[in-house]
Amino acid sequence: QAQNHDDVYDDHFKKEKVDYKKILSPADLIELKQGYEEGIDATIDNNATTKEIRYLAKAYKKSGDKRCITAAENGVVYLLKAQYKNGGWPQFYPDFSNYRSEITYNDNAMINALSVLLDVIEGVNDLDVINEIYISYCNVAIQRGISCILKTQLKQGKQLTAWCAQYDAKTLKPADARTFELKSISGGESVGIVRFLMRLQNPGIEIKKAVTSAVTWFNKVKITGYAYEDIKADNVAGKDRVVIPKPGSTIWARFYDIKNNEPFFCGRDGVKKKTVAEIELERRIGYAWYIQAPEKLLNEDYPAWVAKWINK
């Protein structure tokens, strides 16, 4: 995959997700490099850029090839440049068209960026090879990012809940993304945010409150006794995805109404539906409408964090 002039990476090539194991032909390499001249598709979506930074740092450790560490450090510089002054990150930079300018927690985009910078500061996960001159800049970016996270945690009345997947970059209000991704409280992205906050050393009162409030919300909205599974079906896809009773199983919706916590679902028409069965097949089987990601957070990670920082 080619690094563009912004020292960052796209996550697609020829309109398909990048296959990192694919050996590119000479023609592919030429097309790839030409397409990256302007860097308009530079992104942190789908692990792009952060994944490459980590890969290059690890490659430098193994090979000693200075091109790898130079490219990795250029990627870190890109992350620092792309951050808004309010602490958020857009999904794409410098392309701010449509929803690309929004502060993006979706698919852990902003959390992935923060995690790379925190690894640089702490010298862990192979990022100890990044030049120490970047640490002070990363520290500033981390503090800004934490501030943004705290400011964007949603409230119901006076009670903190969790986070929307994306926010308006200027107003910090919840925002829509694609037509089937309406503003909501996210049962998915909020997990990554909480895990990042729990990673911070010596958390202050605000961070502790943010974490405990989000966990309270996760427990409040969990759906017990059901699972979300693929089944064989007589349709063009040969399958469907449905909610079925399953004792002992716990799931969470991807989208909850900001005011009343009711799960909702959207097809490409952008119209809210109360059940996943009401949206078209293509979206029904093509998106993670229910998840189990909060389960480990609640059962393992959070109790360990409480023992370390709350009950010490």
Residue ranges: model-predicted function:
Residues 1-39, 156-157, 280-312:
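Low-complexity, Ser/Thr/Pro/Gly-enriched N-terminal "stalk/linker" regions
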Residues 1-5, 71-88, 138-158, 210-227:
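Long, well-ordered core segments of solenoidal/helical folds
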Residues 24-62:
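Long, hydrophobic/aromatic-enriched structural stretches that serve as scaffold segments
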Residues 34-48, 97-110, 134, 176-190:
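Solvent-exposed loop and edge beta-strand segments that line ligand/cofactor-binding
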Residues 45-58, 105-121, 185-199:
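Well-ordered alpha-helical segments within folded domains of soluble proteins
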Residues 52, 57, 67-79:
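Active-site-adjacent structural elements in enzyme catalytic domains
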Residues 59-62, 82, 120-123, 152, ...:
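Residue-level signature of the C-terminal ends
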Residues 119-147, 170-181, 185-312:
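Terminal, non-catalytic domain-edge segments
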